[in-house]
Amino acid sequence: MPDYRSKTSTHGRNMAGARGLWRATGMKDEDFGKPIIAVVNSFTQFVPGHVHLKDLGQLVAAEIQAAGGVAKEFNTIAVDDGIAMGHDGMLYSLPSRDLIADSVEYMVNAHCADAMVCISNCDKITPGMLMAAMRLNIPVVFVSGGPMEAGKVKFRGDEKAIDLVDAMVVAADDSYTDEEVAEFERSACPTCGSCSGMFTANSMNCLTEALGLSLPGNGSIVATHANRKKLFLKAGQLIVELAKRYYEQNDASILPRSIATKAAFKNAMTLDIAMGGSTNTVLHLLAAANEAEVDFTMDDIDELSRRVPVLSKVAPAKQDVHMEDVHRAGGIMAILGELDRANLLDVSVPTVHEKTLKDALDKWDIIRTEDPDVYEFYRSSPGGVPTQVAFSQNRYYSTLDGDREKGVIRNAEHAFSKDGGLAVLYGNIALDGCIVKTAGVDESILKFTGSARVFESQDAAVEAILGNEIKAGDVVIIRYEGPRGGPGMQEMLYPTSYLKSKGLGKDCALVTDGRFSGGSSGLSIGHVSPEAAEGGAIGLVEDGDTIEIDIPNRTIHLNIDDATLAHRRTVQEAKGWHPKEERKRKVSKALKVYAMHTTSAAKGAVRVL
């Protein structure tokens, strides 16, 4: 039976000094011997998804204390990708994921904590904490701050639901007046919480449900609703139970690596494909699997993408649907329930809250349960009042959305598409693969052939798009923006948004070794591997080359002969793999260290030492 890790610093004559310091934090005689639970918070006033988390760590801590544990809170950093977008700040976003993972490891191991509650929300924070949980392999429960309510704007006689991406698109569309743009800006983000669509933050918080590491509703109930408080209270109670089961009953089945097995990772990816989640989730699941020492690869993702249908379309894939609508339809447990009925899940896997995923679905899937409390939970609605306060409203929808033929969540028979919401493409321009969010691609351009317009940076591409230099039929190539080449693998939300602004969303493709925001849609192909900076063929594309994209057949092809490609490679290798044009970009020592150790997107952009 394993000893409590904290016993290292709380027991024995020689630990008198350490105990003296513990006492200075408020511990008493009776606390030594209880499990010490790290409450890993990520409050910051920089990020709307985290601005309301300040007091929630202590809310969880009080439940831990009441359940017989000792709670000790600390904070990680949190980068807001939307605010960091469009300038050199975005270079720091993906590297912050690894910094978060390291900071959690440092704090938990330095102080010998026994278990963790991870309070996350936005883009790189949930993945960073997930990587740390897999690395540390101690009992953990994830609970996120929750989605923002969708914005509402009265525009030209109609009220419509909007989000951050809408504000970005109209800002670059000359058909909108300054006053109209300002109204979109003021209305797009009305409350605290992670941006309201199926963007990266919400995608990852949904995937923690499928991995079995968070409670039902974690990914879908809005941040402002009083019922979300129940998740935080339950997390505090549950983590003490899990810690005692492991350390006092030798039950290793509740450890993260016992729960997040390869089957669980495949379940999570299946969910991601079915709900058209962010392409960033591919990076993050690969990275978490790497930390868990699970053999989960791009090949697994490719295989799943060929047989999992799209059961839900949420903004940006369907602009009038947001996370609050997914919750009303039964949330993630409802999507998992439909996947189970289609025999696309392994429901024998355990979770932190039920013995198996099957048990969880029997209890929480609104189609199979008759529990009125579950129905009420999923009727939790937005409040419609701008606020930065968590749990500040208690409004309910009058009914649930249980329509599985035409509703927000469909069954497999009535799927939005029989082909999955994400796809892995291979070809001579991407030997190790690249990713496209097919749920956001118009059917008319699933097969696309166009002429390359090559840019050595995101900034140059944006300038060309806004300068009306991009025409219908172009394939915009943005390279040297990968994990190593950026460095930091910037998101390309501005280029994709501006293509929409210019009316080119269905007439152009964008191909990059960088990545995309979860808010991106259109024929946006990212994570091209190998990246240009490590000798990838994307670095050999020239203006005017023909690029052939065939999503149904999972191919992307640079249409030049092998001899020409080989000649270009010889010439480029002599020059070195770096941008042909100098970029106005300050690369700090921290970013240089990241670039030295990072791997390609095909491996999750993890570090190799």
From Swiss-Prot:
It catalyses: (2R)-2,3-dihydroxy-3-methylbutanoate = 3-methyl-2-oxobutanoate + H2O; (2R,3R)-2,3-dihydroxy-3-methylpentanoate = (S)-3-methyl-2-oxopentanoate + H2O. Its cofactor is [2Fe-2S] cluster; Mg(2+). Gene3D superfamilies: IlvD/EDD C-terminal domain-like (3.50.30.80). [2Fe-2S] cluster binds at C122, C195. Its EC number is 4.2.1.9. NCBIfam families: ilvD, PRK12448.1. This is Dihydroxy-acid dehydratase. It comes from Acinetobacter baumannii (strain AYE). The gene is ilvD.
